[in-house]
């Protein structure tokens, strides 16, 4: 858990012990003498702490990497220090943007009815529809099968169905036309369905046609049907050179397939996967230890938990 103590607080803790004039947010940039030196001392102390050990638990984070068909190697994030190669998983890329509604309903276009469409902060964030519809277009591959998952809650226990439509235009039903009704009120209901794309652009439409109740959509998820999450096996670069590089370097797509292994590149700035990926819809999830950023503004905080902040000052 990251700390909450600001750079300004840390500086003033030191200045107070030295019986020096403390800074405020308005005087922070105009620091002088011992005040400026204290700024530098704190950053030096933080640097010493973070460089004493590479794998501090509070610097452990995760990221995702979109995969491109035929592309073998990828670079680590800018703040990367060391990767946990036991954490690399290959999954199907999530195609819906902001389908979790964590803080807003951005990326969704509403279709007016007699009611409204709005953001609800209930749960982890939801799209609230009351006699309103919302849709989003996603990129798809013609004739490719996809999984769609939708969770909805009925705030007034009215038993009103949510229309879920998938097609080549907003409210289109060429690929899927179904409803989702909540019967276990308070628990919600989940739709698990599949569809086959008939266009490179596919529209997902959610529609509550009644003002009798709010239908709260908790999440919408779409991914390719035939991609099963797989842990990537780590192999050393030496083993990659000795074992499979001859296959990957052949200028032919015949050997493109679902990647099974991951290796660290020789410069330690990235990773490679093998076999070469056969599609663009894969995504790699992995964890790594990041490098810290020096404190600079008054409101900057440490990655270090507050309980350990006295180590710095």
Language model features with spans:
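Extracellular carbohydrate recognition and processing domains
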Residues: 171-201
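Glycine-enriched, solvent-exposed interface loops adjoining structured elements
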Residues: 1-99, 106, 178, 183-187, ...
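Extracellular glycan-recognition surfaces and repeat-rich motifs
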Residues: 103-127, 253
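Extracellular beta-strand ligand-recognition surfaces/modules
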Residues: 192-222
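Extra-cytoplasmic beta-strand recognition segments
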Residues: 101, 132-157, 191-195, 220-222
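Beta-strand acidic-aromatic groove motif in beta-rich domains, primarily in extracellular
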Residues: 157-168
